[in-house]
């Protein structure tokens, strides 16, 4: 494949149509498990086949940032708990029941399958996102990632 061939490729040629998705009713815990098991950093949120949003590690990290561990004081090898552990436990339990729909980003940058790879790469760079859902009329068709685009360039050393 030469450089001209890459420029002619469309998002639909390289998108991953089998990328894992989440439903808005699933929990944050479900999302974390999916990310870990699938080695991904984000997933489209789909409701009745339509793209409803996207949830990323950043959404989950910022959500959990509100929960602060009370901490410990270590004095001469002895540990003294600080703060209110009951309050911490209650906040952690509340977080465990939070749904993906509550933390997802609803305004999603998307491309269509006929979009150029340059268009997808521009969205990724300007909006600082790693995953761009590929959609047609709100119907999710797949995703294209930074790695998909970078891999094409690495596998095509002729520039």
Indicate where each model-derived feature is located:
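Tandem CBS (Cystathionine beta-synthase) repeat/Bateman regulatory domains
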Residues: 1-159
């Amino acid at each position: 494949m030469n450089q001209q061939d890459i420029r002619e490729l469309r998002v639909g040629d390289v998108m991953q149509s089998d990328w894992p998705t989440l439903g808005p009713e699933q929990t944050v815990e479900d999302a974390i498990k999916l990310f870990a098991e699938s080695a991904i950093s984000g997933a489209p949120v789909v409701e009745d086949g339509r793209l409803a949003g996207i949830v990323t590690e950043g959404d989950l990290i910022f959500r959990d940032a509100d929960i602060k561990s009370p901490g410990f004081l270590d004095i001469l090898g002895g540990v003294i708990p600080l703060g209110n552990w009951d309050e911490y436990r209650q906040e952690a339990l509340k977080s465990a029941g939070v749904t993906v729909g509550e933390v997802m980003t609803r305004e999603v940058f998307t491309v269509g399958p006929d979009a150029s790879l340059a268009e997808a790469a521009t969205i990724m760079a300007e909006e600082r996102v790693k995953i761009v859902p590929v959609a047609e009329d709100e119907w999710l068709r797949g995703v294209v990632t930074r790695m998909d685009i970078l891999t094409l360039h690495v596998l095509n050393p002729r520039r």
